[in-house]
Regions:
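C-terminal amphipathic helix plus adjacent low-complexity
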Residues: 26, 30, 123-141
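Catalytic binding pocket for nucleotide-activated donors in carbohydrate/polymer assembly enzymes
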Residues: 81-117
Length: 141
């Protein structure tokens, strides 16, 4: 599953990179936010109710997300090691680079993979898909 949040800024760099590296037969749920996906051969939904997004993340093999706090925490609560791709201000994807700080901190704690669109590859997705995060409910908290 791919989630780009609901920001007014597009994140075309990530969509285009995923289309380059994903196998043609990959089944992907694209929550594309305001990122235009017309003409790309995919069906994106602009937004999803929070409970549906959480359920989709629990069912997904891998979660690729912008590095928004809500998306990252929802993926972790679903037991997924999210692949976080921060939006960057220099590409007009956000107002500042706080998503880079979020992704860097989560990766330093072993709670996410932080990667740029250019460095994202299939191997990264496979490693994240093979990983799980233990949630509080699983350890009796």
């Amino acid at each position: 599953m791919v989630t780009l949040g609901t920001l007014k800024y597009g994140f075309e760099r990530l969509i285009h990179r995923l289309l380059e590296i994903l196998p043609a037969d990959a089944e992907v749920l694209w929550q594309s936010g305001s990122t235009g996906v017309g003409g790309l051969g995919i069906e994106g939904c602009e937004s999803m109710p929070e409970d549906e997004l959480a359920a989709a993340m629990r069912e997904a093999d891998v979660v690729v997300s912008h590095a928004g706090v809500g998306s990252a925490l929802t993926a972790l609560e679903a037991g997924r090691l999210p692949v976080l791709v921060p939006r960057l201000v220099r590409f007009g994807e956000h107002v500042d680079d706080h998503q880079n700080q979020i992704a860097t901190e989560l990766e330093s704690r072993g709670l996410a993979v932080n990667v740029t669109p250019d460095a994202l590859d299939l191997e990264t997705l496979l490693v994240a898909a093979a990983s799980r995060v233990v949630t509080g409910s699983e350890v009796g908290c």
